[in-house]
């Protein structure tokens, strides 16, 4: 079974800016096992590689400039899973297989790879509970305040796609993904297994918008880390796309920061957890489904108020 995203490979135009961004974002710089690249990891061990955008080892890009070039998904039963994937994907563009992996190109042009999962569960990473009416989960303890974010895991990726129907069908029929919710003719929220968080992949169709990366999202521990991470990025002089805020469609709290690696990077937490019994909702795309509330441009670390336009 596919378990989630474990490796992202980016081709970038500015290595120095990309390295600073990932360090400020709270990812851990470690010695890369791929020559000529930089490697950062989340707390559970997921990997983000930085290549030069013209590195011949990278797959073809789906858009110009700095962007995501390859997504690797983990498998919890690699022997059976690889055999099943090989059977399902053997007629797909870019198909390759070895004893350890299967790879192809999805209908959106993105290279996707599947291999044995290597990320670690982190049961020791706990946070203080939320006190709500009728449910007391924190006693004689204060909620935490975070100086910066330290992402736990890669949560999901979001791509612009000019052919939503074809790409959605590929992930559901070829890879066994589940539809969680949808914007009619506009977007599909997909999770890679029946029981799991709201989405591992979101496909977004906008008229006349070609294939490209919208954002990459990283799980943090709680809403307080969303805020602490975003404030630190403001303090480190990175611009906010939008956030903090909350998505009603998934219940998640978010903060998106513009990234020199392409698209935006998102801190998020509190997304819905679904099972096979969940019935997908198909809604017309509406602003109030994307944001219950949100702050455009972020919060200023000094004033703790909305960033004022220049």
Which role does the model predict for each range below?
Residues 36-41, 188-190:
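Minor-groove-contacting beta-hairpin "wing" of winged helix-turn-helix DNA-binding domains
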Residues 1-31, 42-99, 105-155, 159-184, ...:
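Glyoxalase I/VOC metalloenzyme domain signal
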Residues 244-249:
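Conserved blade-ending motifs and adjacent loop-strand segments that build the rim/top face
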């Amino acid at each position: 079974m596919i378990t989630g995203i474990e490796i992202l490979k980016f081709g970038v135009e500015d290595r120095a800016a990309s390295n600073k961004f990932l360090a400020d974002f709270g990812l851990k710089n470690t010695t890369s096992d791929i020559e000529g690249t930089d490697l950062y990891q989340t707390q559970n061990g997921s990997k983000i590689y930085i290549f030069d955008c013209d590195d011949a080892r990278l797959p073809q890009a789906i858009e110009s400039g700095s962007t995501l070039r390859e997504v690797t998904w983990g498998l919890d039963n690699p022997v059976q899973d690889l055999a099943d994937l090989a059977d399902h994907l053997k007629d797909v563009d870019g198909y390759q297989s070895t004893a350890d992996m299967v790879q192809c190109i999805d209908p959106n042009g993105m290279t996707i790879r599947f291999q044995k999962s290597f990320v670690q569960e982190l049961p020791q990473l706990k946070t203080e509970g939320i006190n709500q009416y009728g449910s007391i989960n924190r006693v004689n303890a204060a909620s935490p305040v975070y100086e910066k974010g330290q992402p736990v895991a890669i949560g999901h990726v979001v791509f612009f796609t000019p052919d939503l129907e074809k790409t959605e069908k590929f992930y559901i029929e070829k890879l066994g993904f589940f539809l969680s919710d949808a914007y009619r003719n506009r977007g599909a929220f997909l999770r890679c297994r029946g029981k799991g968080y709201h989405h591992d992949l979101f496909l977004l169709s906008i008229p006349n918008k070609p294939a490209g990366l919208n954002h990459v999202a990283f799980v943090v521990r709680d809403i307080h880390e969303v805020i602490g991470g975003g404030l630190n990025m403001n303090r480190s002089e990175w611009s906010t796309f939008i956030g903090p805020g909350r998505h009603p469609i998934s219940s998640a709290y978010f903060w998106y920061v513009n990234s020199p690696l392409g698209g935006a990077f998102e801190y998020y937490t509190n997304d819905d957890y679904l099972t096979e019994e969940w019935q997908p909702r198909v809604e017309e795309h509406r602003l109030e489904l994307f944001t219950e509330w949100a702050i455009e441009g972020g919060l200023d670390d000094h004033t703790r108020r909305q960033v004022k336009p220049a």
